[in-house]
């Protein structure tokens, strides 16, 4: 049976697929739009093994799970409002209305108008979170301008939550990367905490332009001990590998070259050369055995 198994949040209704551009790469990605959320589709499964699902009396040949999780619209809104309200020098220089924003948003692709139609309140709320707001005056509408400090505060809060909820598998991998060469030396917990913080910030900013990760770099000085430790650890591991290679070369038997040369078979040229010195003097010619008597 053809089909796929999707896991959706509870009470999700009116699901429909939409294709939007990834905010960082521009690559088209498929999302699931519901009545109040835009869901990212994550494919879960082992590609090296062929699996299927039993659903009732049917077999679904596609053995993957497709987990749909709500995404923060900040990733979609941020590059658009930045382009509209900041100069090319990345400096705020004007305000725009919500209608101007929606017009630009809808021109991003054929499925964007459907998203703005369903999630208009969500988009407006996102603008309020990351922008300076000029309230309407008379006939002039409410206008918005991207506020860098608001975005940075949101990203820092997200990074803190991500750090506190890193999967155990990631923490274990970070411990391996920081493990001292001397097993008797304990792993510095302060450096592990810094590594988790750094990794969490990278996860939060992975769908954003690199400049936003760099804007969190006020704590780069805090990361200096981590960078120094990992650099020294890398150099120490390199020296250890070189020492092991040198030790293995010294363990090789000294007469191994002599033994191998004695076991070599003479090549054809050597055999031909030796045959030149063979003499058949005193031997009866083979033709003499065939003479008539």
UniProtKB/Swiss-Prot annotation:
Biological role: Non catalytic subunit of RNase H2, an endonuclease that specifically degrades the RNA of RNA:DNA hybrids. Participates in DNA replication, possibly by mediating the removal of lagging-strand Okazaki fragment RNA primers during DNA replication. Mediates the excision of single ribonucleotides from DNA:RNA duplexes.
One GO process term, biological-process aspect: removal of RNA primer involved in mitotic DNA replication
UniProt keywords (A-Z) are: Cytoplasm, Nucleus
Q: What is its subcellular localisation?
A: Nucleus; Cytoplasm
Predominant location: nucleus
Source species, please? Schizosaccharomyces pombe (strain 972 / ATCC 24843)
Gene Ontology terms, cellular component aspect? cytosol; nucleoplasm; nucleus; ribonuclease H2 complex
Protein name as it appears in the record: Ribonuclease H2 subunit B
Region forming the signal peptide: none
Q: Where is the composition biased (Basic residues)?
A: 265-276
- Share what the entry says about its subunit structure, partners included: Component of the RNase H2 complex.
Give the UniProt family note.
Belongs to the RNase H2 subunit B family.
**Top-level taxon of origin:** Eukaryota
The gene coding this protein: rnh202
Region Disordered, annotated ranges: 251-278
Q: Does the keyword Transcription regulation apply?
A: no
């Amino acid at each position: 049976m053809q089909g796929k198994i999707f896991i959706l949040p509870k009470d999700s209704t009116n699901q429909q697929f939409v294709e939007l551009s990834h905010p960082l790469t521009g690559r088209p990605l498929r999302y699931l739009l519901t009545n109040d959320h835009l869901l990212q589709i994550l494919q879960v499964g082992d590609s090296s093994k062929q699996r299927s699902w039993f659903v009732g009396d049917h077999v679904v040949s596609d053995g993957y799970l497709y987990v749909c999780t709500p995404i923060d619209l900040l990733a979609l809104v941020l590059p658009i409002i930045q382009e509209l309200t900041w100069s090319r020098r990345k400096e705020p220089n004007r305000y725009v209305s919500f209608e101007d924003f929606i017009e630009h948003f809808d021109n991003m692709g054929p499925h964007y108008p459907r998203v703005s139609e369903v999630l208009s309140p969500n988009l407006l709320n996102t603008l309020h979170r990351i922008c300076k707001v000029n309230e309407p005056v008379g006939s002039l509408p409410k206008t918005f301008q991207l506020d860098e400090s608001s975005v940075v505060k949101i990203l820092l809060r997200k990074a803190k939550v991500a750090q506190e909820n890193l999967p155990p598998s990631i923490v274990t991998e970070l411990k391996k990367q920081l493990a001292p060469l001397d097993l008797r030396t304990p792993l510095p917990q302060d450096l592990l905490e810094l590594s988790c913080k750094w990794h969490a910030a990278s996860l939060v900013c992975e769908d954003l332009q690199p400049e936003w990760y760099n804007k969190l770099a006020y704590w780069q000085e805090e990361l200096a001990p981590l960078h120094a430790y990992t650099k020294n650890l890398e150099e120490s591991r390199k020296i250890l590998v070189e020492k092991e290679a040198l030790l293995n070369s010294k363990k090789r038997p000294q007469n191994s070259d002599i033994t191998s040369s004695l076991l070599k078979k003479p090549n054809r040229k050597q055999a031909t050369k030796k045959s030149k010195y063979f003499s058949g003097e005193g031997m009866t010619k083979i033709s003499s055995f065939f003479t008539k008597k």
